Amino acid sequence: MARRKRAAARKKKVKKNIESGIATINSTFNNTLVNITDSDGNTMAWSSSGACGFKGSRKGTPYAAQIAAETAAKTAMEDGLKGVEVRVKGPGSGREAAIRSLQAAGLEINAIKDITPIPHNGCRPPKRRRV
């Protein structure tokens, strides 16, 4: 019988002491994504409502956004992160909840920017829903 090869040993995660970073919250109607990067744009931690175990329409709720932001903040704070500049994108209901939970997790919020893309009369929008 052929022997199984042993899996390669993983390197231990090196703790980086990064004082400040950028937290990008992308909140859509269906989900909320939280990505925490250092000042160069390298991802330190990320989370989403779906990755936290929410399924279907519950991913779009403010509570799911709160849990996602908490998870990402805890992971980033293990790397030594203390303060963040928050960039919010999208029209979803989890925007404010995610910002509040970043602050409650112990991160100092230095600035809040809204970077939602707004067209200057670009593409034609989809037709209105008739329910």
Swiss-Prot record:
One of its GO terms (molecular function) is rRNA binding. GO terms for cellular component: ribonucleoprotein complex; ribosome. Part of the 30S ribosomal subunit. Interacts with proteins S7 and S18. Binds to IF-3. The gene is rpsK. InterPro entries: Ribosomal_uS11, Ribosomal_uS11_bac-type, Ribosomal_uS11_CS, Ribosomal_uS11_sf. One of its GO terms (biological process) is translation. Coiled coil: none annotated. Belongs to the universal ribosomal protein uS11 family. Located on the platform of the 30S subunit, it bridges several disparate RNA helices of the 16S rRNA. Forms part of the Shine-Dalgarno cleft in the 70S ribosome. Keywords: Ribonucleoprotein, Ribosomal protein, RNA-binding, rRNA-binding. This is Small ribosomal subunit protein uS11.
